[in-house]
Amino acid sequence: MLRQFDVIVVSERFANGSTIPPTPPFTDPSLGWFFVDDINKGLEASEAEWIIVASEQVKVTREFLNNLAECNASFPMVDSLAPRIRTANGFVGAKVIGKNGDFVQIDENASIRYVAAPQPDIAAFSRRIVQRTGRVDNSLPEEFQLADYSLRMLHAGGRMLNIPYLVIEGSPDNKSQNTKEYNAGCIKTLYKSLGISAAGKFALRHPQSWISLFSGIKALNVKRKAAITLSKMTAEMLHEIRE
């Protein structure tokens, strides 16, 4: 029998067993914990109906998991969820594709809606959508790995839902990323799942990002073909994740 939840906590400090994994904050027969440096290691080991991917910057508690279970029961056909993060300065929410072609955070008071990507620190996926979507692309910057995964889910027929009352406590790492690295990761993520038109809209404002895209276009095309073959994504699904 499958566990109800597996929590994958991702941190570079867990690489190659270089540190003793921390003791889980709590245990339960229906819950598994995995402390890894690569999300895929956790996905491969997971045996739960729902898989939570989290950084060390958020606090996975019993209350959060109980709320997640209630959301799963209320929305049984939903494949993934993007929790809001409650910080000392307010809420941090999921992201949609903005009018400027970039990922933009939804309004703090946004109602229930489908989104393009979660915050990089927390997301929940059903086993069924993980089985259809496959592995996380860890060649992308960490900031875009879950965004890429959620966009690829569209082609597998899955969508990510933002539910305002699904909240987790945390303090996301707001360290500034190198602009060049951000733009490179963003344009590759957009191109893989949404094609040259989405990549081009982003590049209109960040023309140097074309260099990052075309320098690795052959490998990206292989990944894009794998993602979109037999795609179930519709125009309506794409419209729902835009600003």
Q: Predicted segments — roles?
A:
Residues 1-22:
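N-proximal low-complexity "stem/linker" segments adjacent to membrane-targeting elements
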Residues 51:
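Short aromatic/hydrophobic "clamp" motif used to bind/position activated sugar donors
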Residues 105-128:
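A recurrent flexible, glycine/aromatic-enriched loop bordering the glycosyltransferase active site
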Residues 117-122, 134-151, 155-162, 166-169:
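Donor nucleotide-sugar recognition loop
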Residues 159-240:
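Active-site-adjacent helix/loop segment of glycosyltransferases
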